[in-house]
Each structure stands twice: as structure tokens, then as C-alpha cells.
Swiss-Prot record:
Mg(2+) 4 binds at residues 30, 45, 75. It comes from the Bacteria. This is Thiamine-monophosphate kinase. Mg(2+) 2 binds at residues 47, 75. Substrate binds at residues 54, 263, 319. Keywords: ATP-binding, Kinase, Magnesium, Metal-binding, Nucleotide-binding, Thiamine biosynthesis, Transferase.
Length: 323
């Protein structure tokens, strides 16, 4: 069964949540009205996901809904923001009720998990794409930024790198593994990334600079270095790569995935040495799991990769939306 724009909004996206105390007006008027709490900054991020470019054509609506929200949440995590509101715009070839029901159910499930309220959006006809704008609050003025890294800072990564790329390679049938359990694990890492919201909030009073790894470590760390006017030395022997990857793939494969492939949605951040004790407290409390991979240097030294105490040549890569 097909629906028009207003029927889609009414049936699948309106009145699924209670308004929060700062939401004056949500879906149903020309604009949403929200009140920003005193002494808070509002962080805003927008992402568009296009079929065939950002997600595979055979992705289920359930997985698409989850991932579209998760990748936006990751941007808030990189700023140290607490998720609050979201808008959704869907462009789709036809208003398939079965597809919409599955999508909206998964969509509200992740929204409720992270206490996000849908406050508006749009629907249109055309090739499948999802556009989300997400809003988060930051108490005080301690937002995490890309441009605050300092010479001498230590560089850390949360979690492990490369598993999402391995999962995508399996989905695209570029890579094959006999172990079904491992295949399913890696595919899930690609389809259902975990945004590091609590880690980002905890890092507000610890880190100098941060970014989420959406386009690959080399590419995204490069944004920190460019914005901070710094260089970096990275020890490849300390890059956090899971035993699943090291046991099942060649070193060239998993190192390339870890360095150049995106969609891990882990956080890369820098801290001054004086804040190591604060970070260790967060690690001990299991708020953050992270690995030190190098340190910030002066801009003229550039970005250097060190392996077994030797500088190696590498190709700067990463995901590019216009290739």
C-alpha cells in the first residue's frame, strides 16, 4: 500500500514519543520550537546517506534506520555532546508501507535508546537517500574540537579499528571466510556501529582535541593536524586491531583497513600529559577503553608512521564522498 507525504508522517513518524521539557513544538507545524537550557551550547550535525554510495542497495530498512542515526550520533560524540533532538528527511522511489514500518520501528528504537526526540523532517520521491540533522547539548563551554591539539599531546583511539571495513568487504564478497560466526560478527560491526557518546562526554574535561573515525584514521587524524597546525608520529605497532582480524586476514589487509578505511566510528583524541591521571580514572571506571598510538609534534614534521622503530612510506587515503 502506498501513502502520500502527510499520511507517511502521520502513520509512521508522528506521536511515537513524548515531548521533552525543552521541546515547545515538534512535528505538525511549519517549524519545530525548542528551548536551549541556560549555560549550554547547541551542537548540530547533518549527514546525508545515499544508496549505492553510503550504504549497499540490499541493506534492510531495519539496518539502514539504525546506521543512519548511529553515524550522526558519532558526530555528537566527537564534540562531547549529549543527544537531544533529531530531524529526518527520507527520499524514496515509492512509499512502501512494509519498508516504512520496518524502518520506523528500528528508527524509534535507537532514538529511545539514546533519548533522542524526533522534532521534524520531510519526505520526497526519488532515489533512496536519508538526511538527518541531529542536535546535542554541551554543558558549559567545554566542547571537543578538532583544532585544539597541542605539541606534545598523546594520541589515543577508542576501541579497535578495521572491523567495519572487514565486514563491508565480506558483504561485497571481496573477502571470504569459512567461519560463519566471525563473518556475522564483522558484518554487524559494519551495519551496527556503536556511537561513543558516553566516552565523548567523559572526554570533555580530559581531551584537547577529538574527531570520530568515519573516513579512516589517516584521513580523520589529518583533520585534527590541519586544524591544529600540528604534525604527529604514529606507532603502527600500537594501533588497536582485534585478534579476529590478525588471526583471519593478512597484515597488509587489516593494516590498510585500520588506517585507510572508514566507518569504525571510534574516537581519535589527544590529551596533554598532565591529564593522563584523569584518563586513567575514566579507564578504571570502564567509561573509556582506549589505546595510545602516538603523539603530536610540530607542523613542519608532518604525519609520520613508525613500524618497528622505522619510518614507513604510506599512501594517504580514506573515504571520499566525491570519488
Amino acid at each position: 500500500m502506498e501513502y502520500n507525504e502527510f499520511e507517511i508522517i502521520s502513520k509512521f513518524f508522528k506521536n511515537h514519543q513524548k515531548k521533552d521539557k525543552n521541546q515547545i513544538k515538534g512535528i505538525g507545524d511549519d517549524s519545530a520550537l525548542i528551548k536551549i537550557p541556560k549555560n549550554n551550547l547547541l551542537a548540530i550535525s547533518t549527514d546525508t546517506l545515499v544508496e549505492g554510495k553510503h550504504f549497499l542497495k540490499n541493506i534492510t530498512p531495519k539496518d539502514l534506520a539504525y546506521k543512519s542515526v548511529a553515524v550522526n550520533l558519532s558526530d555528537l560524540a566527537a564534540m562531547g555532546a549529549k543527544p537531544t533532538w533529531i530531524t529526518l528527511s527520507i527520499t524514496m522511489p515509492k512509499s512502501d508501507s512494509v519498508w516504512l514500518k520496518s524502518f520506523s520501528k528500528s528508527f524509534f528504537k535507537i532514538l529511545n535508546k539514546y533519548k533522542l526526540n524526533l522534532i521534524g523532517g520531510d519526505t520526497n520521491s526519488g532515489p533512496l537517500s536519508i538526511t538527518l540533522s541531529i542536535y546535542g547539548l554541551i554543558e558549559g563551554k567545554n566542547a571537543l574540537l578538532r583544532g585544539n591539539a597541542k605539541n606534545g599531546d598523546l594520541i589515543y583511539i577508542t576501541g579497535n579499528l578495521g572491523e567495519s571495513a572487514a565486514g563491508l568487504s565480506l558483504l561485497q564478497k571481496k573477502t571470504f571466510l569459512k567461519n560463519v560466526k566471525i563473518c556475522n560478527y564483522l558484518i554487524k560491526k559494519h551495519l551496527k556501529p556503536i556511537p561513543r557518546i558516553s566516552e565523548g562526554i567523559a572526554l570533555r574535561n580530559i581531551a584537547n582535541a577529538a574527531i570520530d573515525i568515519s573516513d579512516g584514521l589517516i584521513s580523520d587524524l589529518g583533520h585534527i593536524l590541519k586544524n591544529s597546525k600540528c604534525g604527529a608520529d604514529i606507532n603502527l605497532n600500537t594501533i588497536p586491531i582485534s585478534k579476529i582480524l590478525t588471526d583471519n586476514f593478512k597484515i597488509d589487509e587489516y593494516l590498510n583497513w585500520a588506517l585507510n578505511s572508514g566507518e569504525d566510528y571510534e574516537l581519535c583524541f589527544t590529551i596533554s600529559k598532565k591529564n593522563i591521571k584523569k584518563l586513567n580514572v575514566a579507564i578504571k571506571k570502564k567509561i573509556i577503553k582506549c589505546t595510545c598510538i602516538g603523539y603530536i609534534t610540530s607542523a613542519e614534521k608532518g604525519l609520520n608512521l613508525i613500524q618497528n622503530q622505522k619510518k614507513i612510506i604510506f599512501k594517504k587515503s580514506g573515504f571520499n564522498h566525491f570519488i
